[in-house]
Amino acid sequence: MQATLNSHAVAGPRQGLVIQLASSLTIVGSVMIAPMLPKITAEFAAVEPDALALVPLMVAAPALAIALFAPLAGMLADRFGRKPMLLLGCLLYALFGAWPVVIHDLKLILVSRLLFGCAEALIMTCCTTLIADYWPPQQRMRYINRQVITIGVVGALFFVIGGMAGEGSWRTPFLLYLAPLLMVPAIVNYLWEPDRRQEESHALITPPGSTRRTLLVACFLIFVGMVTCFVVTVMTPTVLVMRGVTSTSLIGASAGLAILSTLIGSIAWPIVRERIGVAGVNALLLACMACGLCVLALAPSYPVVLVAMVLQGFGAGFLVSNASLPLLLVLPAHLRARGVGAFTACLYLGQFASPLIITAIAHPLGGMPHGLASAILLWALLTMLVALAWLLVGLRQGRMQAGQVLH
C-alpha cells in the first residue's frame, strides 16, 4: 500500500481512472432509481397519503443534501485529508445507498436518501480536489474534462441498467449501490494523500481578493448553468405531453439525445476553449442553452424538441469543466477542498432549485402547466443576458491582451 502522505509520487492514468470512476458514483445515485419511481409510487400509495409528493423527492433529496453538506465536506477534506474522506464517502455511499432494500417506511427511505447525498458530497468534493492536488494546470484541465465525460457515460449506462434491474422489484437496483465497495482496494492502493505543504511552497501567490472573486464567479456560473440545464431535464416530459407526445420511449429518446450532445460538448471543450478562451466559452455555452430553452418552449412538434435537446446538451457539455477550471487554478492547497465544496454545493443547489424557480416564474403567468412555456422563455432571456455579459468580458480581455502584445 502507498504511504499515506506522499510528496514524491507522480500521478498517472491509473490514478486518473480511479478518480474518474469514483466521481461517476454521484450521477449513478440519481439516474439509477429514476425509472423505478412509478413502481415505488404504486407500492406506497395505499399506505402513505403523501406518496405522490414524497416519492419524487427520492431523486431530489440527494441533490439537496449535497448542496447543504458539500461545504462541510470540503472542510473535512482539508482538515483530515482527501483520501480518508473519500474512503469514508464510498463506505457510507454503499451503506445508505443499499439501505432502502430493507426499509418499508417511505419517510425512512427519504432519510436514507438524504444521508446518501452527504456521502455523495464527500466523494465529489474529494475527487475533484485530488485532480487539482495530483496534476499541474495543463494536465489538470485534461483530467477535469475526462471526469465530466466519464460521469456522462456512466450515467447513461446506469440509467439503462437501473431500468433492467428493476423489472422484477423496485428494490433490486438499490443493491447496485454496494458496487463502490469494489473500489475501496483501488483507492487504498493507488491513491495517496498529497503533501500540501510542499505544494504551497512552490505555488504562485494569488491575492486573496482575486481567489474570492474567482470562487464567487465560478459558483454563480455553475448555479445559473445548472438551473438552465435542469429546466430541460425536468420540464421536457411535461412539454412533450402538452404537445401530444405520451410515449415513454420517445420521451426517453429525447433525454438520451441530450446526454449524447452533452458528451460531444465535453469532448469538444478543450478545442473550443483553446480558440476562444474561458470567457468566450462561458458566453457560448450559456447562449446555446438559452437558445435550446427558446426552441423547447416554442416547439410545435417532437422533431423540433430534439433540436432543443441538441442545442442545450452541447452547451451543457462545456459547463462544469469551464466553470471549475479557473477556480482549481487559483485555490491554494490548504483551502482547495473548501472551495471545491462550495462549488459543488452551488452545482447541486442549481439542480434542486431549477423546478422551483420555473414553477415560481410560471405562477403569475398562468400557473403550471399553462404558464410553463412563458416561464421557460423568460428564464432563457435571463440566461442570454448573462451570456452577453460574458461576451463583453471576453472582448475586453481580448483587447487587453492585444494591447499588451503591442506594448
What is each PLM-predicted segment?
Residues 37-67:
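Extracellular/periplasmic helix-loop-helix junction of adjacent transmembrane segments
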Residues 137-138, 146-192:
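Helix-loop-helix hairpin linking two adjacent transmembrane segments in secondary transporters
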Residues 57-73, 256-268:
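Central cavity-lining transmembrane alpha-helices of secondary-active solute carriers
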Residues 68-81, 265-278, 362:
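Helix-to-loop junctions at the C-terminal end of transmembrane segments
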Residues 67-106:
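Conserved MFS/SLC helix-loop-helix module at the cytosolic interface between two early adjacent transmembrane helices
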Residues 106, 112-151:
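Cytoplasmic helix-loop-helix junction between adjacent transmembrane helices
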Residues 214-256:
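Extracytoplasmic gate region of multi-pass secondary transporters
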Residues 173-189, 373-392:
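Symmetry-related core transmembrane helices of the 12-TM Major Facilitator Superfamily/SLC fold
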